[in-house]
UniProtKB/Swiss-Prot annotation:
Organism the protein comes from: Ricinus communis
Statement: the UniProt record of this protein carries the keyword GTP-binding: no
Entry protein name: Probable bifunctional methylthioribulose-1-phosphate dehydratase/enolase-phosphatase E1
UniProt-annotated binding residues for Mg(2+): 291, 293, 486
Keyword Cell membrane: no
Classification via NCBIfam families: enolase-ppase, HAD-SF-IA-v1, salvage_mtnB
A GO CC annotation given for this chain: cytoplasm
Pfam families according to UniProt: Aldolase_II (PF00596), Hydrolase (PF00702)
Binding, Zn(2+): 134, 136, 209
Length: 527
């Protein structure tokens, strides 16, 4: 085993990591053995067959900062299942080779450090990794070929997602896909760009090739590698069954060509229509605007979950964040609203003392006003903005989770596949809307939404609000917009602005007046 001449690096005034003594230390020897053991295991899994694939691990030493720790790397072009501990390369943190394996007799080729070396070093540099695995597992190759144009692999609602760092069962796991090249080292820039654009990822797929996976330690990298390969295999098998692995309910794959007709022009055929036995098939507008309460989400969720949470936590929130610019802005808006309420004689409005009266007195008055506003279900910006900030804390602390009807995710996915833009218009703040759809009982649905509107564009029962929306969503005519709501007065206002409007009928919604004149639906799947 040859040791290359390299500058010795002193760590904390102790042993030099590039010294011969350190290269022969127990930590280095144990890491050599570990890599050879893992390569045999990975060979049996099909990850490193045909001399392909590789693994690298940093030599863990508590006395040495991770960026300065030695790197052990398997060689290239060798039978991975037959490697011995002495076959490993030892590199300094900057990538210079400190020790290389001795040549073996014919038919073995001369030793060569892994072709993956530059990519391994990039993962160490950008992700502070402790180990990196490069797999040629068949499943990691096939998932990139199912959709040859896709730049991402996505999957959600699978138990093994929990094994990926920073992810849970309801989360959407996204793995970037980069294009393969003739030589491994040519992938380095693409890998770096993917890591930069996907800061949460711990893996990058290479189309028609394999995957790079890293972790804080060899255990983390190995565990995640096993989970990634499981999820890829699951996606392939779901695809074979005609099921969509990327959606929460893993329903049937929506074949867009079959849905819109393979012999028809997409621009005209996407108007799939509104199915209503009383009115026949109507053409679907270019974009859809959805209300939340009673349309996508049960009214009870807002009334029985969100409002009580805001009411019960307003005091705690104001005390904890009183000095922040955000909360001071909230207080300023509330002051203006309360002053207007007092001038108009609104019941239960309480004068808010000036700031110099003391934090406790100001907060007590704010709490009294906010509780009264919530009780009266007032649709005012000052209240909605503060509620959004309170709810944000609840969602971040996993104390809140959005609820949508079972038909909502599939409908959103279908419209998204057809290129139909979908917006939300609610009396709740845009922040609150993003929170509700960002963490639902079906995962993150924001990827299907093009934007959010709140009362800053106007009251939902005023026609001018819908005129403002129609001028913001990029349609040629207001009639190209379909507005879905459970409130007749809102439908009337939308119709007055030239929008198409339908009424959502859900359990718990308020009864509709007779002869209201609008189409009705019981599920978004009817659109």
């Amino acid at each position: 085993m040859a040791a290359a001449a390299a500058p010795a690096v002193a760590v904390n005034g102790g042993v030099k990591v590039a010294s011969q003594a350190y290269l022969e230390s127990k930590a280095v020897k144990e890491t050599r053995v570990l890599i050879s053991d893992l390569c045999r295991q990975f060979y049996n899994l099909g990850w490193v067959s045909g001399t392909g694939g590789s693994i690298t691990i940093k030599v863990h030493d508590d006395s040495i900062p991770k960026p300065n720790q030695l790197i052990l790397m398997s060689p290239s072009g060798v039978q991975k299942e037959r490697m011995e501990p002495e076959d490993m390369y030892v590199l300094a943190a900057n990538g210079s080779i400190l020790s290389s394996p001795s040549p073996k007799p014919y038919p073995h080729k001369p030793p060569k450090c892994s072709d993956c070396g530059p990519l391994f070093l990039k993962a160490y540099e950008m992700c502070n990794a402790g180990a990196v695995i490069h797999s040629h597992g068949m499943e990691s190759c096939l998932v990139t070929m199912i959709n040859p144009l896709s730049k991402e692999f996505k999957i959600t609602h699978m138990e093994m997602i929990k094994g990926i760092k920073g992810h849970g069962y309801y989360d959407e796991l996204v793995v970037p896909i980069i294009e393969n090249t003739a030589y491994e080292n040519e992938l380095t820039d693409s890998l770096a760009k993917a890591i930069e654009e996907y800061p949460k990822t711990t893996a990058v797929l290479v189309r028609n090739h394999g995957i790079y996976i890293w972790g804080d330690s060899w255990i983390s990298a190995k565990t995640q590698a096993e989970c990634y390969h499981y999820l890829f295999d699951a996606a392939i098998k779901l695809h074979q069954l005609g099921l969509d692995w990327s959606t929460p309910n893993h329903g049937l794959i929506q074949n867009v060509k079959a849905l819109i007709g393979s012999n028809r022009d997409i621009n005209t055929s996407v108007k799939a229509g509104l199915k209503d036995s009383n009115h026949g098939m109507q053409s679907l507008p270019g974009c859809i605007v959805l209300d939340i309460e009673g349309t996508t989400t049960p009214i009870t969720f807002v009334a029985d979950v969100l409002f009580p949470y805001a009411r019960d936590n307003v005091g705690r929130h104001l005390y904890a964040t009183y000095e922040t610019a955000e909360t001071q802005d909230d207080i300023k808006l509330l002051r203006t609203q309360v002053e207007d309420d007092l001038a108009r004689g609104v019941n239960e409005a309480v004068s808010i003392p000036p700031d110099d009266a003391g934090k406790e007195e100001v907060i007590a008055a704010l709490v009294a006003n906010v509780e009264a506003m919530i009780k009266a279900d007032r649709k005012i910006t000052a209240l909605k903005q503060l509620q959004g900030h309170i709810w944000r804390t609840g969602f971040q602390n996993n104390e809140l989770e959005g609820v949508v009807y079972d038909d909502v995710p599939e409908a959103l996915e279908k419209w998204h596949a057809l290129g139909i833009k979908v917006y939300i218009y609610s009396s709740g703040s845009r922040l609150a809307q993003r929170l509700i759809f960002g963490k639902t009982n079906y995962g993150d649905l924001r990827k299907y939404l093009s934007g959010f509107f709140d009362t800053t564009v106007g009251n939902k029962r005023e026609t001018r609000s819908y005129i403002e929306i129609s001028e913001s969503v990029g349609v040629d005519r207001p009639s190209e917009i379909l507005f879905v709501t459970d409130v007749v007065q809102e439908a009337v206002a939308a119709k007055g602005a030239g929008l198409e409007a339908v009424i959502s009928i859900r359990q718990g919604n308020a009864p509709l007046p007779e002869n209201h004149g609008f189409k009705t639906i019981n599920s978004l799947s009817e659109i």
